[in-house]
């Protein structure tokens, strides 16, 4: 959630940026005075992990999972990206680009820098520019999404400024994977699931949300957020198990959809007049306009959240905190809202707690005691315990890659080699091990 391009209410204070990390275990906040990281391990307390005041006007701050690797962009140098080891307070490398940096995405393989009309793909192991996607359709909001999965390492970005085409790019093999005609209107939001095999999309119209298989591009699900009014979708987010999808907008409602395929029952012969009438109604849908038929087939929200505000830009996440499912909403009003979420029953979610994003304590912020209706689930997050450190990096070595269009450089190659990504305890970053 980048707020640098819009005016922010006084209640948000100095907030310029907020985002969850890849597995929703921490929250990054950028402000006019620097940046902070908060742990999301507790509902009752927003524990500050780290605070930096050396860099002012931080409009982008992205953390790699729970490691110490952080990517930073400041309003004072909007074309410059700095990659740092925040626990040591050292800069690993920096790059400068031809235009303002609008978004930065990271996983354990790649770092993506999004400009208005180009995308830069860096190898996160040595920060070298591997590929540049040039002359993309104008993308002033920096809309893009990078899968956090190392094997299905796909990048999605708008393929058109006038209609909702999605370009899917394979960042490992550095080639286009697919073009998905997702919507009639321009895209407003994109999100991969944790496995990198599903992509959720929403258009500027905001009434329909679709989920596609990746890389095939087959439509798997279609959900209707509303009918009466068009809205601006702010955020899409899957749960870590890919069963649920949350969607927030500039309205007061957050919708949570369940990705399930309803098994069709075998047709039964009607035994009453109402049965015959129902069968006639179902048969008549084949003669209705396609738009009306689609509305009959679209899924509805499994659960909803009523936010205490309307009109603020926000981000949402479905997280597991202390083995219980929660919906998190970080908003431009300067607060993090935590709601209960019942993955079995759904329904209306209740506000449990709200925290100020500047980390300050506020009395009477507790809304609801932990309920006996909370259902424990298995932890959905990646393990991210980091203990090992490495020697501080040597001074930055600058180089100009004329064919790739980025001025900058990584630390000396032998120093970058110290970032052993095949060890779980390396800091930063780490490679996920699966059993």
UniProtKB/Swiss-Prot annotation:
Any one GO molecular-function label of the UniProt entry: phosphatidylinositol-3-phosphate binding
Gene Ontology cellular component annotations, sorted alphabetically: cytosol; phagophore assembly site membrane
Region of interest: Disordered: 386-435
Chief place of localization: membrane
Keywords per UniProt: Autophagy, Lipid-binding, Membrane, Repeat, WD repeat
Membrane topology recorded in Swiss-Prot or TrEMBL: Peripheral membrane protein
Subcellular location: Preautophagosomal structure membrane
Placement of sequence motif L/FRRG motif: 223-226
Record GO biological process: autophagosome assembly; autophagy of mitochondrion; cellular response to starvation; glycophagy; nucleophagy; pexophagy; protein localization to phagophore assembly site
KW Thylakoid (keyword) present: no
Pfam family, one: PROPPIN
Protein function: Component of the autophagy machinery that controls the major intracellular degradation process by which cytoplasmic materials are packaged into autophagosomes and delivered to lysosomes for degradation. Involved in an early step of the formation of preautophagosomal structures.
Family the UniProt entry places it in: Belongs to the WD repeat PROPPIN family.
Protein name stated in the entry: WD repeat domain phosphoinositide-interacting protein 2
Protein species of origin: Xenopus laevis
The gene coding this protein: wipi2
């Amino acid at each position: 959630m980048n707020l640098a391009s819009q005016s922010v209410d006084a209640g948000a204070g100095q907030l310029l940026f907020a985002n969850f990390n890849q597995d929703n275990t921490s929250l990054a906040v950028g402000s006019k005075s620097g940046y902070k990281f908060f742990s999301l391990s507790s509902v009752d307390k927003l524990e500050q992990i780290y605070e930096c005041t050396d860099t002012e006007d931080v409009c982008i701050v992205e953390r790699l999972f729970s490691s110490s690797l952080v990517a930073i962009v400041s309003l004072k140098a909007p074309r410059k990206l700095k990659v740092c080891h925040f626990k040591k307070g050292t800069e690993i490398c920096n790059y400068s680009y031809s235009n303002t940096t609008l978004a930065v995405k990271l996983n354990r393989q790649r770092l993506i820098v999004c400009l208005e009309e180009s995308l830069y793909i860096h190898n996160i192991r040595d920060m070298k520019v591997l590929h540049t996607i040039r002359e993309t359709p104008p993308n002033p909001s920096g809309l893009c999404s990078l899968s956090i999965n190392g094997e299905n390492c796909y990048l999605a970005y708008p393929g058109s400024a006038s209609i909702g085409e999605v370009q899917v790019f394979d960042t490992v093999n550095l080639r286009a994977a697919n073009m998905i005609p997702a919507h009639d209107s321009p895209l407003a939001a994109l999100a991969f699931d944790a496995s990198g095999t599903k992509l959720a999309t929403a258009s500027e119209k905001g009434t329909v949300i679709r989920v596609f298989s990746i890389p095939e591009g087959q439509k798997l699900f279609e959900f209707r957020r509303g009918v009466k009014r068009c809205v601006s979708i702010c955020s899409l987010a899957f749960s870590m198990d890919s069963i649920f999808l949350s969607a927030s907008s500039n309205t007061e409602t957050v919708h949570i959809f369940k990705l399930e395929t309803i098994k069709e029952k075998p047709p039964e012969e009607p035994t009453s007049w109402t049965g015959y009438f129902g069968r006639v109604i179902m048969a008549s849908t084949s003669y209705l306009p396609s738009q009306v038929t689609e509305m009959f087939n679209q899924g509805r929200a499994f659960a909803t959240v009523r936010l205490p505000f309307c009109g603020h830009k926000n981000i949402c996440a479905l997280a597991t905190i202390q083995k219980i499912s929660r919906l998190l909403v970080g908003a431009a009003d300067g607060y993090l809202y935590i709601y209960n979420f019942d993955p079995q029953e759904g329904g209306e979610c209740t506000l449990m707690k709200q925290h100020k994003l500047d980390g300050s304590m506020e009395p009477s912020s507790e809304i609801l005691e932990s309920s006996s209706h909370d259902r424990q689930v298995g932890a959905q997050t990646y393990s991210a315990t980091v203990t090992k450190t490495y020697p501080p990096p040597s001074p930055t070595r600058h180089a100009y890659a004329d064919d790739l269009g980025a001025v900058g450089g990584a630390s000396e190659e032998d120093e970058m080699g110290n970032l052993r990504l095949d060890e779980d305890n390396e800091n930063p970053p780490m490679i996920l091990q699966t059993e």
